[in-house]
Amino acid sequence: MKHSGFQAKRLIQLALPVLIAQVTQTMMGFIDTVMAGRVSAVDMAAVAVGTSLWLPAILFVQGLLMAFTPLFAHHNGANNQKAIQPLAFQGAYLALIGGLGVMVFLASAPLVLSHMNLEPQLYNLTIGYIDGILWGAPAFVLYQVLRGCSEGISYTLPTMVIGFVGLAVNIPANYIFIYGHFGIPAMGGAGCGIATALVFWAMLIAMAIYMQFHKKFAALAPFSQFHRPDFATMKKMTKLGLPIAMALFFEVSLFAIIALLLAPLGATVVASHQIALNFSAIVFMLPLSIGIAVSIRIGYYLGRDRADISAVVAKVGLLLALSLALSTAILTVLFRFQIAELYNSDPEVVVLAGSLMLMAALYQLSDSVQVVAAGALRGYKDTRSAFYITLFSYWGIGMSLGYTLAYTDFIVPAMGAHGFWTGLIAGLTSAALLFFIRLRYIQKHRVHLSLIEGDSVHH
């Protein structure tokens, strides 16, 4: 078992900096909300509405670029670091195209928002926020490419360091643009958008400097030569990345739409649902970090032609995530009301959120299996299955069952928010099972899904 122990240690070493980086990212969102909220509730709402538009768009591009990391890891495992740089350039071109797409989409935000009958003040502040943040889109997506290179060579520390850089820029930038200092007018929630764009540029520049001068990147020499766009590679990578982008989009859109569908049931229900969901999202960072580490390690060992060790990595990753999920689920059940009180002191909200937390605890178990299994499949370059599995599980099962239970008496009397959570648990459990079955299939049949060197190669 020494082997499993070693793999578990390596996974934790890789996952920990990724986890801390995610915590800093979540902290930034939290700080934005609080600092805008100190101006007024409308400013806080503007940041929330603006985020619900730009986040799905930028995550879509991030999903597209997630396909690169296991490939970088594959080249690293094969001792072929010089193949990473030309591939990263193609990633950067794709990122720029995607980033421009996001900017165009955000520039057309008034068209979308005009259909949402917002109060004039909220509408104007939201547009202001979006007009600021859209200038950060190219920096955000280019940073993802550099981050992928670093994580691809099994070096996740910069991700964490740059996370702290972002946090360090975020607070003073918010202070200046939200409240107005150093001759800059107070812009309220709208200033948050400019501050966030500055954070993205600071993170990109810091990462580029880190990679240029740190000895870890000497063999990679990321900026030593220039590569022209190679459309064949870009097309192949888009084919590999698009299913991940779509899978991410299905997930994000599902949660956004559930929140909208719960709105008619009143503020208490929506608030309770948001509390359970937000807490789940925080807990989700644990298995997500392990999933990212698993995809890096599997790519690395496949590059070394050690499919046997890749299988060990997947198994250890799943066991690690499940044992963590069991611990967090038990803590969630024990402290569910205390957790709800951290968010809101309204007794009605606390009681409802507390009961949803019981469901969130169950949800954590399925969630951890599905995210690690999906990470493992990315390592095997099998991304297409993610598209079908998430579409079927989240929308086919999760959404349809959730809606039926929440709003109709078709199966049981209408359950409201609990109905959607039952649907979510069913959908995630389905995804976890299907991802696991697919993973076993690929390992058993040793299908080395190598899209870059031509199509499927059987070992």
UniProtKB/Swiss-Prot annotation:
It is found in: Cell inner membrane. Its main location: membrane. This is Probable multidrug resistance protein NorM. The lineage of its organism: Bacteria, Pseudomonadati, Pseudomonadota, Gammaproteobacteria, Alteromonadales. It comes from the Bacteria. Keywords: Antiport, Cell inner membrane, Cell membrane, Ion transport, Membrane, Transmembrane, Transmembrane helix, Transport. Belongs to the multi antimicrobial extrusion (MATE) (TC 2.A.66.1) family. Multidrug efflux pump. It comes from Shewanella oneidensis (strain ATCC 700550 / JCM 31522 / CIP 106686 / LMG 19005 / NCIMB 14063 / MR-1). It holds the Pfam family MatE. It is a multi-pass membrane protein. The chain crosses the membrane at residues 12-31, 46-68, 89-111, 121-143, 155-177, 187-209, 244-266, 281-303, 316-335, 350-372, 385-407, 417-439. NCBIfam families: matE (TIGR00797). GO terms for cellular component: membrane; plasma membrane. GO terms for biological process: monoatomic ion transport; response to antibiotic. InterPro entries: MATE_fam, MATE_MdtK, MdtK-like. GO terms for molecular function: antiporter activity; xenobiotic transmembrane transporter activity.
